[in-house]
């Protein structure tokens, strides 16, 4: 049985380093054009080459996203972009546009094609169509259950196509790749890399007949929670998923490091016994790490057939973090917090007050005789009162510190000395993304 590949996002070089150090098997990233996250920092061909060299040396693959709808006049430039990405060392290209995928398969047959979730592959016909286009992998639509994924994985195996599934991160309210809300409301097309996040805006619910507002569970009526499949990794492994994808090219290196590290540890427990799949769940600390990295509230959503209010985040459309306790008292600009978990200087806390939410960074920290944390409130948090809930939206201890030399690669060196001949030095290392021995010699 082949282990699930852990596929991590990278919107910049720091996030790439974080993904590799946290244990990703592969990283997906975008160039400056033709990708669905044009708001990320993204990569140039030059920095893509650097990314490929860094990752391949450490046994990690790089997939480049060309995952938007391409206009007729852009096909030539898109093909050239694909060609340059492949020459730079990309291991695969992730494509949304059917026409572009067909053209790449025709003009550049050596390139490995992966079908984006934006192509909305949700049935056997879609899998077989991808195989006819020459694709080697399909990222399935996110609206599928584990049972449906298992069926499509079997269809894919018969057609010679792997299946990839999203396992963690933001969900869309519309079908994968079929959303026109951003275009209609914000004048920015999600299928052109410019999603305006219209589903995260506040809305009112009205009775169309009587033209009056109705009561609603919150303002953000179209905002889903975040997908979290960390409790289902054994099920996804048995279903035949080849790659588990983490969303987040617009998110920070801290997020990438935290989320990838948790999924890496749990997946390793799933495959603890070689050749079999073991039940594995996250620890409470691991679950908290995911919440603090970014959370609108978590759901398994369609993976377990959930389609109702349970998958929605009506109250807020952004990061809520992890609950850590309540304010015991607040006076003279000092908040005393009965915290259930240890706080640290540099943490970002959010107080849920009767008048809204107030966030601040912990710049000083002391403790009273009862061991309760005491922090000085800044101007934004002056409305904090006793009883208010406190959430941590960024953990200083989980912050990622970039170092492009990490993780270091173990090498073996040998020196050869012979009288009358030049000194010869050789270095070799066994781990590359292709699993081959690499050796360098010089005199």
Predicted regions and their residues:
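Active-site PLP-lysine loop of aminotransferase-like
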Residues: 122
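Surface-exposed amphipathic alpha-helical tracts and adjacent flexible/coil segments at the periphery
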Residues: 1-21, 26-36, 51-52, 58-68, ...
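Alpha-helix capping/helix-boundary segments
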Residues: 99-100
């Amino acid at each position: 049985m082949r282990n699930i590949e852990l596929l991590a996002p990278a919107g910049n070089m720091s996030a790439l380093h974080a993904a590799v150090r946290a244990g990703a098997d592969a990283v997906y990233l975008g160039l400056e054009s033709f990708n669905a996250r044009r708001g990320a920092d993204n990569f140039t061909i030059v920095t893509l080459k650097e990314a490929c060299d860094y990752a391949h040396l450490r046994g990690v693959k790089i997939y480049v996203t060309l995952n938007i709808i391409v206009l007729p006049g852009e096909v030539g430039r898109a093909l050239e972009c694909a060609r340059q990405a492949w020459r730079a060392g990309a291991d695969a290209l992730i494509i949304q546009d059917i026409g572009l995928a067909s053209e790449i398969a025709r003009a550049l047959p050596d390139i490995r094609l992966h079908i984006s979730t934006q192509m909305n592959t949700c049935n056997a016909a879609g899998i077989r169509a991808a195989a006819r286009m020459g694709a080697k992998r399909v990222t399935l639509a996110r609206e599928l259950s584990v049972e449906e994924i298992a069926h499509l994985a079997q269809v894919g195996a018969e057609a010679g196509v792997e299946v990839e599934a999203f396992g963690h991160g933001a969900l869309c309210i519309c079908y994968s790749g079929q959303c026109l809300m951003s275009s209609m409301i914000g004048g920015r097309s999600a299928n052109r890399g410019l999603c305006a996040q219209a589903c995260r805006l506040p809305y009112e619910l009205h009775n169309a007949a009587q033209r009056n507002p109705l009561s609603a569970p919150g303002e953000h009526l179209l905002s889903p929670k975040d997908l979290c499949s960390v409790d289902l990794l054994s099920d996804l492994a048995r279903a035949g998923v080849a790659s588990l994808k983490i969303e987040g090219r617009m998110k920070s290196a801290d997020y990438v490091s935290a989320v990838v590290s948790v999924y890496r540890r749990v997946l390793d427990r799933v495959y603890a016994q070689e050749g079999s799949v073991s039940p594995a769940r996250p620890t409470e600390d691991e679950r908290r790490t995911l919440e603090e990295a970014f959370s609108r509230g978590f759901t398994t959503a369609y993976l377990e057939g959930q389609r109702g209010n349970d998958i929605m985040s009506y109250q807020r459309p952004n990061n809520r973090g992890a609950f850590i306790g309540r304010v015991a008292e607040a006076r003279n600009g000092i908040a005393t917090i009965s915290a259930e978990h240890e706080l640290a200087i540099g943490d970002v806390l959010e107080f849920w007050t009767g008048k809204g939410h107030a966030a601040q960074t912990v710049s000083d920290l002391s403790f009273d005789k009862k061991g309760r944390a005491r922090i000085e409130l800044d101007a934004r948090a002056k409305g904090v009162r006793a009883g208010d809930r406190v959430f941590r939206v960024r953990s200083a201890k989980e912050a990622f510190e970039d170092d492009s030399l990490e993780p270091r690669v173990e090498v073996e060196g040998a020196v050869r000395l012979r009288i009358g001949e030049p000194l010869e030095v050789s270095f070799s290392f066994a781990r590359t993304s292709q699993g081959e021995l690499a050796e360098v010699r010089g005199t």
